[in-house]
C-alpha cells in the first residue's frame, strides 16, 4: 500500500502494481499512453516530483509521498500554450507520443525557461516519435517555452483555404490526451482477451485442452477454431491467414493463434493462457526464399503446391538488346533487410455486443470497411451485425492493414456476449503484424556515352513470410517502379515472392519501391562516375518531363515535377561539392492511388446536420497523415464556407461510405476528389438557400480512379492516375562521418497544407535514415530477437538538420491538384546516404543497413 498525490489529489493505492496500470485502469488518465510497457518508447511519461519518468517502470509501493503530474494535471494556461505551440509548429501527426513529449518538455521548461534547440532535443531523447522526425516537435517545445515565458498565447489564424499552413483539427485532443485511441476505451463490465500462440513456426496441432483454463475463476470463455461460425481464414487479398489454428492443422509462423481466452481482468487472462494445454508435432520449416524454393521444400500453406506466393514479369522494349549495345554497362547485386514499422500504438480493439446479436468494433486500423468485410465473413454475418468505428490511430505506415486483433475481439464478443478489449503486447506486435519485405535484387543497367539510360534488366526475390498479406502487390510495385523516374524505353524485370515460416511481410511505407529504389539509384550513382558526370547531371539528363513516356509506357501529365525537385536541390548540392563535403543524391517516384486496373474508389458524403453545419463523412482512416484536416480545407475552399461551418465526423461503417484503405498515398487524391465533387453539389444547392434551409440533406461525391491493368495491350497504358516525385540529398560531416544535413525536395502537386507536407517529409527522411543506417529486425528460426528498444530507431538528439522543400506544382485536375506524399518521403533516402558514404571513404555499399559507418561499426 502507498499514499501519494496525483494531479493535486491525494490517493491511496492498496494493491501494488505498475504506476501506468493504476493511472490508466483505475484513474482513467488516458494521456498516459501504453506504447510498450518495457521502458523503451516514452509514451507513458509523467512527472514524479518534477522529473519526467516513464510510468511503466515504478511500482506504486515505491511512490509513498510522491507528487505525480500527468498532462491532465497541467494548468489551463499550460494546456492552451502547448496546444497552440504544437499546432502552430505542425508537431502533431498520429499523436500517440505527444502527451509524453509534453511532459518531457514541461520538465525541461520548469528548470530552464529558455532552452536551446539542442537542449530541447536532448530533453525528449527518451521519447520516440515515428511520424514527425522530431523536427517540428522541437519547434513546438521552443515555441511553448516562449509562450510560457511571455504569458500570452498568440491569436490562431482561422484561414482554412487550400494552400494555407493550418493547425490540424485534432491537435487539442492529442496534445491534451483526451482523444480516444482504442486502448483508452473503458466500458462497464469490460473483459480482456488474448491469444495463445504457437510454440513453433511450423507444427501440427495434435490437440488443445482448455478445461483447466476454463475452470479458473474470472475466465469468461476459451475459444478454439471449432467455435468460428463463419470462414476460418481472413486475409487482405488472399484468404490464407487463419483466425485460429485447429486440431490437426499446421501452423504457418510463431504468431499463429491456437486459442483465445477471455477473462474479467488482465491478471486472470495471463494465468488462463498458461493453463491452455496444446500438444504439437514439430515439423521442418523454411526460413528464406532459397529454402522455400528448393525442390521438396515443406509447404508453408498446405495445398498451395509449393511456396511461390507471387510472380510478376514486367517487360517493355528489349532491355537485353539495348544493354548489349550500350557504351557503359553495370551489373550489381543488392540486399535489403526486414524492418519493423514500430508505430507507437500497439494494436488494440474493443468489441461491444449489439442488441441485434452482432458486434461493434472500436479499433485502430487502416480501413474500417476492410475490417468489417473480413470480420463479418469470419462471423458469418451481414454488415448490419458487424459494425466498425475507427478511433484515433496511433500510426500505421502499412502495418495496420491486416487483421491483428480485430477478428479475435469480434469472435469473443460475438460468442460470449461481453464487451472485450484485445490488445497486443509490444512483443506480440513485433511478431504478429506484417513487416517490410527483405529483398534480394540483381540489376543490370546500360547507358550511352552521354549517360542516357538505354535499358535496365533486373530480378527481385522477396520473403513474404507466413501468409500473403500484400506480398503480391508489394512485389508488383517494386517491379514497376524499379525503372525509376526516367525517360527510356527498354526495361525488363522479373519478381518472385515466397512464403516462409517467418513472420509475415506486407505493406510498409514505400510499398516495395523503397527496396528497388535503393538498387536503381545506387547503380545510377555508380554509372555517373563511369560516364564521368555528376550524379545530379545524370539524373537531370534522364529525368522524366511532362509529355514524355515512362518505361512502363505511361505518358506523364503537366503536373510532373521531377525536374523542379532537382533544380530546387541544386544550390545545396553545388555548395556541398564546392566545400568538399561528402554528398549523395537520389531521386524517386511513387504512385498515388491503387492503380494497375484495380478498383479504386473515393467516396464522401456532406451531410447538413441539425446544427446547421456541414458534416464530412468519408470512410477513410486518418492514421496520422492529417486526412481530416485536408477534407475540412477542401470543403472550406470548394464550398466557400468558413471553418466554423464544417465538422469532420471521422470514420464509421455505420455512417460513412467506403473510401478504401489508407495506403498507396491515395486518400488525399482519391477521397479528396470525391469530397471536391460533393462540394460542387453543395455549392449549387446553396446558390439560393442557406445551410439552415438544407438541414437533413446529403451531398454525395464519388471518384473512380480508372487505370489499365499490368500488361494491358495498349500503346500507352495508364498505370496510375498520378505520381509524386522527389530528390533527396545527404551531406556528411567531413570529420565525424555522421550526417550533417539532409535536403529533401518533393513534388506534391498542390500542397493542401504545406505545414503538414513538411512534417511528412521530415518524418519520412528520419524513418529511412534508420532504414539506411541502424534499423534491423533480426530473426532466429522465425523468432524475432529484438525488443522495441533495440530496433535501432533514431532518437531526437541524433537528428541532423533537415531541409524540407515542398514543390507546389498544380496541374492535376483532381482534388484541387493534390498528389499524395505519405510514402515517397522515405524512398530515396537510403541510396542518397549510401552515395554520401562512398564519397566519404570510397567504399560502395549495396546492402542495408550500411556497414562501416559511425552508426554501425
Residue ranges and their predicted role:
Residues 225-226, 381-385, 415-420, 449, ...:
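C-terminal catalytic domains of large/alpha subunits in multi-subunit enzymes
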Residues 90, 164, 170-176, 306-349, ...:
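Glycine-rich loop/linker segments at domain edges
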Residues 46, 173, 179, 348-353, ...:
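Short beta-strand elements
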Residues 1-156, 596:
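Signature of N-terminal electron-transfer/Fe-S-associated modules in redox systems
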Residues 145-308, 329, 415:
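Flexible, low-hydrophobicity surface segments
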Residues 257, 264-265, 418-465, 673-692:
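Phosphate/diphosphate-binding loops
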Residues 124-182, 566-569, 576, 582, ...:
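Intrinsic disorder at enzyme termini
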Residues 296-379, 543-613, 633, 693-718, ...:
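Helix-loop-helix junctions that connect adjacent transmembrane helices in secondary transporters/permeases
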Amino acid at each position: 500500500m502507498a499514499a501519494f498525490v496525483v494531479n493535486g489529489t491525494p490517493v491511496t493505492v492498496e494493491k501494488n502494481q505498475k504506476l501506468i496500470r493504476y493511472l490508466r485502469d483505475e484513474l482513467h488518465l488516458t494521456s498516459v499512453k501504453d506504447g510498450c510497457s518495457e521502458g523503451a518508447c516514452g509514451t507513458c511519461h509523467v512527472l514524479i516530483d518534477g522529473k519526467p519518468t516513464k510510468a511503466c517502470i515504478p511500482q506504486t509501493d515505491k511512490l509513498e509521498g510522491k507528487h505525480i503530474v500527468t498532462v491532465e494535471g497541467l494548468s489551463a494556461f499550460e494546456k492552451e500554450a502547448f496546444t497552440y505551440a504544437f499546432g502552430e509548429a505542425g508537431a502533431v501527426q498520429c499523436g500517440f507520443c505527444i502527451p509524453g513529449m509534453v511532459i518531457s518538455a514541461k520538465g525541461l521548461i520548469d528548470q530552464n525557461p529558455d532552452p536551446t534547440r539542442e537542449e530541447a532535443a536532448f530533453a525528449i531523447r527518451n521519447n520516440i516519435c515515428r511520424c514527425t522526425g522530431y523536427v517540428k516537435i522541437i519547434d513546438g517545445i521552443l515555441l511553448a517555452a516562449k509562450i510560457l515565458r511571455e504569458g500570452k498565447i498568440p491569436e490562431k489564424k482561422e484561414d482554412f483555404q487550400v494552400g494555407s499552413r493550418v493547425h490540424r483539427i485534432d491537435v487539442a485532443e492529442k496534445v491534451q490526451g483526451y482523444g480516444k485511441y482504442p486502448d483508452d476505451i473503458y466500458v462497464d463490465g469490460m473483459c480482456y482477451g488474448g491469444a495463445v500462440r504457437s510454440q513453433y513456426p511450423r507444427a501440427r496441432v495434435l490437440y488443445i485442452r482448455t478445461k483447466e483454463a476454463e475452470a479458473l475463476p474470472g475466465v469468461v470463455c476459451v475459444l478454439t477454431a471449432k467455435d468460428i461460425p463463419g470462414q476460418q481464414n481472413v486475409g487482405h487479398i488472399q484468404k490464407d491467414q487463419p483466425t485460429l489454428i485447429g486440431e490437426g492443422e499446421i501452423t504457418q509462423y510463431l504468431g499463429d493463434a491456437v486459442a483465445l481466452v477471455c477473462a474479467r481482468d488482465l491478471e486472470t487472462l495471463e494465468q488462463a493462457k498458461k493453463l491452455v494445454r496444446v500438444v504439437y508435432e514439430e515439423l521442418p520449416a523454411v526460413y528464406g526464399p532459397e529454402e522455400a524454393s528448393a525442390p521438396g521444400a515443406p509447404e508453408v500453406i498446405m495445398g498451395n503446391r509449393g511456396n511461390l506466393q507471387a510472380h510478376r514479369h514486367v517487360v517493355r522494349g528489349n532491355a537485353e538488346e539495348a544493354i548489349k549495345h550500350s557504351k557503359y554497362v553495370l551489373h550489381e547485386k543488392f540486399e535489403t533487410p526486414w524492418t519493423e514499422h514500430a508505430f507507437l500504438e500497439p494494436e488494440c480493439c474493443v468489441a461491444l455486443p449489439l442488441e441485434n446479436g452482432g458486434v461493434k468494433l472500436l479499433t485502430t486500423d487502416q480501413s474500417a470497411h476492410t475490417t468489417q468485410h473480413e470480420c463479418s465473413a469470419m462471423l458469418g454475418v451481414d454488415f448490419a451485425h458487424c459494425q466498425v468505428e475507427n478511433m484515433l490511430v496511433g500510426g500505421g505506415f502499412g502495418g495496420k492493414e491486416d487483421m491483428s486483433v480485430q477478428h479475435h475481439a469480434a469472435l469473443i464478443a460475438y460468442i460470449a456476449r461481453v464487451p472485450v478489449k484485445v490488445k497486443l503486447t509490444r512483443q506480440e506486435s513485433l511478431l504478429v503484424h506484417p513487416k517490410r519485405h527483405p529483398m534480394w535484387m540483381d540489376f543490370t543497367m546500360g547507358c550511352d556515352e552521354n549517360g542516357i539510360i538505354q535499358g535496365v534488366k533486373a530480378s527481385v526475390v522477396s520473403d513474404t513470410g507466413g501468409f500473403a498479406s500484400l506480398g503480391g502487390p508489394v512485389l508488383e510495385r517494386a517491379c514497376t517502379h524499379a525503372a525509376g523516374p526516367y525517360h527510356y524505353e527498354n526495361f525488363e524485370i522479373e519478381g518472385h515472392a515466397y512464403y516462409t515460416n517467418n513472420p509475415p511481410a506486407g505493406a510498409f511505407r514505400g510499398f516495395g519501391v523503397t527496396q528497388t529504389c535503393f538498387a536503381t539509384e545506387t547503380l545510377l550513382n555508380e554509372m555517373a562516375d563511369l560516364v564521368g558526370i555528376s550524379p545530379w547531371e545524370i539524373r537531370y539528363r534522364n529525368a522524366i518531363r511532362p509529355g514524355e513516356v515512362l518505361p512502363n509506357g505511361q505518358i506523364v501529365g503537366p503536373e510532373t515535377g521531377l525536374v523542379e525537385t532537382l533544380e530546387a536541390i541544386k544550390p545545396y548540392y553545388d555548395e556541398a561539392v564546392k566545400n568538399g563535403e561528402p554528398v549523395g543524391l537520389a531521386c524517386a517516384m511513387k504512385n498515388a492511388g491503387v492503380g494497375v486496373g484495380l478498383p479504386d474508389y473515393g467516396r464522401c458524403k456532406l451531410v447538413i446536420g441539425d446544427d446547421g453545419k456541414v458534416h464530412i463523412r468519408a470512410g477513410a482512416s486518418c492514421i496520422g497523415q492529417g486526412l481530416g484536416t485536408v477534407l475540412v480545407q477542401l470543403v472550406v475552399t470548394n464550398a466557400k464556407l468558413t471553418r466554423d461551418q464544417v465538422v469532420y465526423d471521422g470514420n464509421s461503417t455505420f455512417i460513412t461510405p467506403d473510401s478504401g484503405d489508407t495506403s498507396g498515398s491515395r486518400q488525399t487524391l482519391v477521397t479528396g476528389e470525391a469530397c471536391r465533387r460533393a462540394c460542387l453539389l453543395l455549392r449549387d444547392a446553396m446558390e439560393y438557400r442557406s445551410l439552415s434551409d438544407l438541414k437533413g440533406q446529403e451531398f454525395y461525391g464519388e471518384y473512380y480512379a480508372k487505370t489499365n491493368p499490368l500488361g494491358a495491350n495498349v500503346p500507352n497504358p495508364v498505370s496510375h492516375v498520378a505520381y509524386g516525385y522527389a530528390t533527396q540529398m545527404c551531406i556528411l560531416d567531413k570529420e565525424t562521418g555522421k550526417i550533417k544535413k539532409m535536403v529533401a525536395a518533393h513534388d506534391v502537386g498542390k500542397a493542401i497544407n504545406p505545414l503538414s507536407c513538411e512534417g511528412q517529409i521530415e518524418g519520412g527522411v528520419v524513418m529511412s535514415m534508420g532504414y539506411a543506417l541502424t534499423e534491423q529486425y533480426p530473426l532466429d528460426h522465425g523468432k524475432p530477437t529484438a525488443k522495441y528498444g533495440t530496433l535501432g530507431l533514431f532518437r531526437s538528439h541524433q537528428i541532423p538538420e533537415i531541409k524540407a522543400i515542398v514543390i507546389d506544382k498544380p496541374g492535376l485536375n483532381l482534388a484541387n491538384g493534390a498528389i499524395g506524399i505519405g510514402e515517397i518521403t522515405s524512398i530515396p533516402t537510403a541510396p542518397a546516404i549510401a552515395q554520401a558514404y562512398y564519397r566519404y571513404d570510397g567504399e560502395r555499399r549495396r546492402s542495408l543497413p550500411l556497414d562501416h559507418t559511425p552508426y554501425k561499426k
